[in-house]
């Protein structure tokens, strides 16, 4: 039985972490490397950095963040946002990222998944999928969750798996930011259909939500941002709770 993973998510814009960060003991609350080190010390299993910098010219800043993080942090981390080519992947992996995450670019050009997987190995390729329930059922959304592609979720999950993705990062747009728990039913279905690790994202509000996403959702990892950034839940406390409830975690 593989240990379940707890994964803080850091949204980085112009080299700073955004989306409310409240850390009293840090000199620079928005410094991604400091935050990454803090989560590493607390026992997080992995980290995800999402580069939400608007302009393409500023991508160099993210490479610096990746290089610094790789030197100072000893847990695996994934970088996503703005990756459109195999060359983009190569630059981030060479800078020290363990995995890259692709979302809209993969939907527009599914061959990118195959190319990345062939070149770097499937273990490096995470496909992020944003989904929302519509009248036609769950469908895939792109461009930050604003555009419905009309692609049925399960069709895309099967294609992503077939093309060599190593894992899926599944965000339920309806649950994101709501703090009412993860969308466990759809996470469970995606985990069963894909048969590759699924990281659940969107909806964490309490420590019970994490137990439920592992128990009911059968997720391999649980990603969250604000509950960690605002110190509503500490990684250490969360892992102790999960362990007491019989969930296999790395303590």
Curated annotation (Swiss-Prot):
Coiled coil: none annotated. It comes from the Bacteria. InterPro entries: Aldolase_TIM, His_biosynth, HisF, IGPS_HisA/HisF, RibuloseP-bd_barrel. The keyword Lyase applies. GO terms for molecular function: imidazoleglycerol-phosphate synthase activity; lyase activity. It is found in: Cytoplasm. Pathway: Amino-acid biosynthesis; L-histidine biosynthesis; L-histidine from 5-phospho-alpha-D-ribose 1-diphosphate: step 5/9. Gene3D superfamilies: Aldolase class I. Its main location: cytoplasm. IGPS catalyzes the conversion of PRFAR and glutamine to IGP, AICAR and glutamate. The HisF subunit catalyzes the cyclization activity that produces IGP and AICAR from PRFAR using the ammonia provided by the HisH subunit. Belongs to the HisA/HisF family. Heterodimer of HisH and HisF. This is Imidazole glycerol phosphate synthase subunit HisF. It comes from Natranaerobius thermophilus (strain ATCC BAA-1301 / DSM 18059 / JW/NM-WN-LF).
